[in-house]
Regions:
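Exported/periplasmic ABC-transporter solute-binding proteins
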Residues: 1-175
């Protein structure tokens, strides 16, 4: 059983983190956009996802600049909403979100082809060494099975084993 959207509960076992990654020091617009996501933006996060920080008030200092963000199609719609709402508070900012995939967003950020990347997968150790990153939301995953299936609970590792073909029968899980 999952938690209601907007509830901060990182104990839910079938969830994944939504990451925002960047390379090096943030400029003033990037810094403020990240501050917005951490504070007032969590209200938007909470409409469909699990929040990761307290929903505090936000006051824009209205820095001027552009941000290009590339990556995950899972994170993209959330980032588009966050960018749209942030730009209402700071009309001097321009944020372009391009949805590709997590790996592309991470690689484009490492290569300096975009300012920030979006990822819905865990970062690998070399990526963690090269980039700064922050979890901006958590996405709960629901698994739907036949009502006759006796399984009441499953871990991410067990679910991965099913999807990668390492486990091919349900009975291997509920032994």
């Amino acid at each position: 059983e999952g938690t209601a959207a907007g509830k901060k509960d990182v104990r839910y076992p079938l969830s994944r983190s939504f990451y925002l990654v960047w390379n090096g020091k943030l400029n003033s617009v990037e810094e403020e956009f990240l501050r917005y996501i951490r504070s007032a933006g969590q209200e938007i996060v909470g409409q469909s996802y699990v929040t990761v920080s307290k929903q505090n008030s936000f006051l824009s200092l209205k820095p001027k600049g552009k941000i290009t963000i590339t990556g995950s199609t899972s994170v993209g719609p959330l980032l588009e909403c966050l960018a749209e709402e942030y730009m209402k508070q700071n009309p001097k900012a321009s944020i372009k979100v391009t949805q590709t995939d997590s790996g592309n967003g991470i690689n484009q950020t490492i290569q300096g082809k975009c300012d920030m990347g979006m990822s819905s997968r865990e970062l690998r150790d070399p990526e963690k060494e090269l980039l700064n990153y922050e979890v901006i939301a958590r996405d709960e995953i629901a698994v739907i099975v036949n009502a006759a299936n006796p399984l009441n609970d499953i871990t991410m590792d067990q679910l991965e084993a099913i999807y990668t073909g390492k486990t091919t029968e349900w009975k291997a899980i509920y032994r």
